[in-house]
Amino acid sequence: MIILKKKLAGVSEQSLSLFLTRARKAAGVRGQVQVLVTSSDELRGLNRRFRRKDKATDVLSFPAIVDGEAGDIAISSDIASEYAYELGHSLDEELRILILHGVLHLAGHDHERDKGEMEALESELRDKLKLPSSLIERTTKPAKKAAKRKKR
């Protein structure tokens, strides 16, 4: 299930829900996944509460503790919009990239601890699902460009 906190131009809950189903199957994730697309402020609050990091982030994943559910994913529409602009693709595509990234975390992958396994799998699934470059491959580039733009 996809929950958009606000209307986003060119983004359809139904289309993202269909993609979520494809991403879950591709990653081997069973059970329901809920995706909340919301503000950077809300992601910052979630990040502070659950990871003790007082900063906004693009995507967070929360594995489920209830049978029949895989977990929840929260995505910042603000950061996704910045990434999409910087990388020259649509917001819808960026949300799909972030959904795939979150689903891989729900499947138990962790790019902060593994030795490139998640990056390789994300790249493979990105190609299979016809998405632009993966989140892991490009994480620092958009953030640096956005920071430069804000300083001007």
UniProtKB/Swiss-Prot annotation:
One GO cellular component term: cytoplasm
Cofactor(s) the protein requires to work: Zn(2+)
GO biological process: rRNA processing
Region described as Disordered: spans on this chain: 132-152
Assigned EC number: 3.1.-.-
Transcription regulation listed as a keyword: no
Gene3D superfamilies given in the database record: Metalloproteases ('zincins'), catalytic domain
Residues noted as binding Zn(2+) in the record, renumbered to the chain: 101, 105, 111
Protein's cellular compartments: Cytoplasm
Top class in the EC scheme: hydrolase
Pfam hit, one: YbeY
Alphabetical keyword list: Cytoplasm, Endonuclease, Hydrolase, Metal-binding, Nuclease, Ribosome biogenesis, rRNA processing, Zinc
Stretches with biased composition (Basic residues): 141-152
Co-factor note (free text): Binds 1 zinc ion.
PANTHER family xrefs: ENDORIBONUCLEASE YBEY, CHLOROPLASTIC (PTHR46986:SF1)
Family: Belongs to the endoribonuclease YbeY family.
Entry function: Single strand-specific metallo-endoribonuclease involved in late-stage 70S ribosome quality control and in maturation of the 3' terminus of the 16S rRNA.
The protein, known as: Endoribonuclease YbeY
